[in-house]
Amino acid sequence: MLAEDSYLIRIGRLSYLVAYLEWAVLGDLPHIPGLPPDLGVRKLAGMTTGRLGQTLQSKKILQQVADVDTQDWLRRSGELLEITARDRNSVLHARPATVDGKQMLYRWHPEGNQVFAVDEAWLEAAEQRIRDAIRELSVRRVATF
């Protein structure tokens, strides 16, 4: 038995927001002067959300960027992508379960100290975190078009 359509739509919306945040970062990179070749979109596009976040924050990369505002934007982009990756992974690595009589995803990863229902409240909070990240990066944008 599947979860209700409204719940499944929220899962889809969360997935879309993750992709939107990733592209908000990747799409700006070609328009930021002075970036090293390792930050080429072709090199980064296949990375997971978490790996992309780690790459953008790496000292090796940041040391190659002269502009302080660009360094800050890259670092913060990486941090926000890593936070988003945790939410993304909580959904994608969850399993269907019946909780309080409703079908929903249940994140069960005891070694990672992640055991919880991916319920409406959790989805709302995760969506809000990602929306806030998108807004923050938009305000701090360093790309020139």
Residue spans of the language-model regions?
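Short Fe-S-cluster ligation motifs
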Residues: W122
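Generic alpha-helix initiation/capping and coil-helix boundary signal
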Residues: T70-Q71, A126
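Short, charged/polar, low-complexity loop and linker segments
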Residues: M1-D5, Q64-T70, E111
